[in-house]
Each structure stands twice: as structure tokens, then as C-alpha cells.
Design a protein with these regions (language model features):
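Asp-box/BNR beta-propeller blade signature and adjacent active/binding-site loops
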Residues: 1-196
Length: 196
């Protein structure tokens, strides 16, 4: 007989009173002290928008409560699909990816314009219009990681990777990272299909 684990449901963090209240695709890990670290693409207006930031939430009581969002990554692009893995001794790795600005300007422009609430359309379309004034190196998409050596207090510079997976790598028993993902916005990769 299949035994159902005991669960408790509740809300640990909810953003209210802001057009940037959408938070999506969380990942969580736990350190040797039982502290939970969750990351998500936060401060968004909707599923497809130009605003996502990688935010971390820390819980020291098993997920009953958590810190307010701590922004650990905020590029000019939409930082999506944050992943986190704990590697031991205070060391953790966060992953995310960004579509290039060109994808938003071509493939996602109309879906954003047509699906956004009126209060979201202005900021979203304004952000897309600002891309033409930014340096080209800030508008390239890709898959990225940052590493913390001090339980998420500080983070390394951004490291670009050729693959992406929504929740990042896993740690093997010997401490080696294994990262199975899809090639995304590397020099030999194509852009994604247009949303349906």
C-alpha cells in the first residue's frame, strides 16, 4: 500500500499591492544545519515579461516562515528558471537563463502586448523599447551560474554555461556536480519556437 507523506500547506511569501507580484518556478535546497534556501524568478508581471530577477528566500524553521526576497541577480533581461544546489560547507550554486532581447522584440512582443493587463502593458512595452539604447553585450541571452562560498551572503561574478535546465544541477555522492540540460543560446544553438 502506498503511504502518503504528511504534508502541511501554506503561504511562506506572497507579494501584494504591486504590478511586479508574479513569482515563478522555484527551486529549494537545504544546508547541513537544516536551513532552506529557495530561489525563484521574482518581481515579474506575468509568465512572459521582461522583468524577472533571481531572488532568494531563506527559512530557518523548515519553511514555516522565510525572509523577504533577497535579489541576487538582476540583469537588463528577464532572469528565468532559477535553480539552486547546496554543495556543502556553505557553498551553493544558483542557475538561471535569459532569452536574448531579440527574442522579446520579435517573438514575444505581441504576446506581451496582447496578454498584459493594462497596468502591466506600459512598463513591459517600455522596457522592451529601452533595449535599443542598451549596450549589445547586455542584450545577449544565455545560461548562467553564480557561486556563493558563505551560505548565500555574497555571490561570485556571473559564469556563462552552454546548457540550461530549469532547476540546475545535482550533487553526486562524491561531491561532483552533474548538470543535464538543453543547449541554449550558445554559439551553435537556435532560438526557441514562437509561443503558441
Amino acid at each position: 500500500m502506498l503511504k502518503t507523506p504528511e504534508t502541511e500547506h501554506g503561504i511562506v511569501n506572497r507579494v501584494t499591492g504591486s504590478v511586479f507580484a508574479y513569482q515563478g518556478w522555484p527551486s529549494v535546497c537545504r544546508d547541513e544545519n537544516g536551513v532552506l534556501y529557495a530561489v525563484a524568478s521574482s518581481f515579474r508581471t506575468e509568465h512572459i515579461c521582461p522583468f524577472g530577477k533571481t531572488a532568494m528566500y531563506i527559512s530557518k524553521n523548515g519553511g514555516q516562515t522565510g525572509t523577504p526576497p533577497i535579489v541576487i541577480n538582476d540583469t537588463y533581461l528577464d532572469d528565468r528558471d532559477a535553480g539552486i544546489v547546496y554543495m556543502g560547507h556553505g557553498r551553493m550554486l544558483v542557475t538561471w537563463f535569459c532569452h536574448p532581447a531579440e527574442v522579446y522584440e520579435t517573438q514575444y512582443y505581441n504576446p506581451i502586448k496582447n496578454s498584459a493587463q493594462p497596468s502591466e502593458a506600459g512598463p513591459s512595452l517600455g522596457m522592451l523599447a529601452s533595449y535599443r539604447h542598451l549596450p549589445a553585450d547586455r542584450l545577449q541571452g544565455g545560461s548562467f551560474v553564480r557561486v556563493s562560498e558563505d551560505y548565500g551572503v555574497t555571490w561570485s561574478e556571473t559564469i556563462r554555461l552552454p546548457v540550461s535546465a530549469p532547476h540546475g544541477p545535482s550533487v553526486l555522492d562524491d561531491g561532483t556536480l552533474i548538470y543535464l540540460g538543453k543547449e541554449l543560446y550558445s554559439s551553435t544553438c537556435e532560438t526557441p519556437e514562437e509561443p503558441g
